[in-house]
């Protein structure tokens, strides 16, 4: 995986540093390389650490690694959980089929009516950020909607397809934009990557001998409180450096990972101070106002990281961040053109995007409050259920506005 994904990045930086001309190399990247590499590596480590029994049947192991729905963008399956239903015998179950179809439709609804519609807007602003410098902040907000709808929608389709076959896969999202901290966000966003990093990077690093020595040194130097927190902070920084590198071979992704790691590490160091400040300011942790403030604060911090994730370069990301706070011309949104016929991004397009985002928000809000949407829908008579399904299916081609590059999923490139 390292050879395929990072050779050209290393060669490019060597060429720039020493003024040579070694690359680039034109390597054919296998589909889903990162996902099945991590899945296989997790299995090998679980067997090595005696967490699971080795699979002696090579065909069953091949099925675990190459189960087709998850190849492109996960979720990253764990052997002990995925194989419980993957290797089991299955019988035809109409209710299970309907639930799978239901999940697939919801995934494509998010992908086609939110992600692909927002992509028109996002691509124009980020690709021509100097032209549309007055709506940079709207571009990153639209990207936050696009990325979530694209990735979570794709995973919904994957889980739905697996459900058709009676296979249960791990959930990969848990309403991440309702997170109250960056740490909480990463417990809700790309969950299977987070748990993989926790089990196979964070714990081995934080429990290593050199980290133990560093912890003892930190306690002597900074006291017990910071001495305990510093090793965890260093381990988190290493984890998110790896996360950034995993996302792509570019400095912007390394900055993206370090940014998240620094915030989480700093939060860990300041935990005691936060408690004291909240006590002095008489802040009630359980109050609705404080909860909403935490959600908004976290959402803004996450969106800062999206600048680096979506921009082509670090200077572009910094320029757009600057424009977001110094220059705002919302009227520029109506001048955006897309497609070969240079169509305009009309108020109708904007209304469709906002309404679909509102639907997704309401569903997520109800789920966050504990409402079982799918169970509630299953109690309705079949006419109502299928009327909803068909309405969503017909809405996709009629209301969706797809860019020339539409068709794939963003995380399939990783």
Language model feature labels by segment:
Residues 1-363, 367-413:
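Membrane-embedded transmembrane alpha-helical bundles that form the catalytic cores
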């Amino acid at each position: 995986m390292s050879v395929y994904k990072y050779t050209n990045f290393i060669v490019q930086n060597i060429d720039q540093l020493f003024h040579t001309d070694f690359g680039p190399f034109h390597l054919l990247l296998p589909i889903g390389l990162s996902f099945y590499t991590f899945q296989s590596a997790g299995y090998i480590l679980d067997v090595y650490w005696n967490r699971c029994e080795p699979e002696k049947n090579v065909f069953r192991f091949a099925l675990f690694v190459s189960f087709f729905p998850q190849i492109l963008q996960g979720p990253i399956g764990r052997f002990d959980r995925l194989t419980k239903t993957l290797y089991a015998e299955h019988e035809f179950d109409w209710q299970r089929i309907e639930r799978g179809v239901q999940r697939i439709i919801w995934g494509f609804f998010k992908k086609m009516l939110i992600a692909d519609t927002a992509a028109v807007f996002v691509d124009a602003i980020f690709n021509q950020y100097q032209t549309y410098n007055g709506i940079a902040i709207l571009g990153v907000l639209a990207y936050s909607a696009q990325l979530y709808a694209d990735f979570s929608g794709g995973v919904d389709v994957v889980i739905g397809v697996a459900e058709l076959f009676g296979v249960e896969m791990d959930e990969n999202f848990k309403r991440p934009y309702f997170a109250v901290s960056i740490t909480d966000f990463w417990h809700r966003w790309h969950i299977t990557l987070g748990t993989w990093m926790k089990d196979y990077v964070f714990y081995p690093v934080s429990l290593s001998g050199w980290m133990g020595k560093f912890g003892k040194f930190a306690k002597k130097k900074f006291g017990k409180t910071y001495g305990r927190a510093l090793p965890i902070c260093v381990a988190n920084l290493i984890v998110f450096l790896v996360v950034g590198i995993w996302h792509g071979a570019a400095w912007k992704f390394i900055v993206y990972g370090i940014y998240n790691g620094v915030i989480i590490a700093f939060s860990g160091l300041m935990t005691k101070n936060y408690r004291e400040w909240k006590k002095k300011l008489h802040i009630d942790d359980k109050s609705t106002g404080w909860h909403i403030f935490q959600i908004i604060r976290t959402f803004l911090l996450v969106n800062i990281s999206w600048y680096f994730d979506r921009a082509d370069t670090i200077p572009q990301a910094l320029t757009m961040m600057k424009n977001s706070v110094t220059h705002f011309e919302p009227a520029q949104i109506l001048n955006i053109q897309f497609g070969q016929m240079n169509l305009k991004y009309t108020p109708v397009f904007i209304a469709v995007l906002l309404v679909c985002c509102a639907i997704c928000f309401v569903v997520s809000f109800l789920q966050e409050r504990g409402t079982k949407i799918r169970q509630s829908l299953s109690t309705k008579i079949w006419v109502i259920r299928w009327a909803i399904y068909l309405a969503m299916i017909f809405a996709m081609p009629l209301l969706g506005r797809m860019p020339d590059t539409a068709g794939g999923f963003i995380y399939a490139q990783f």
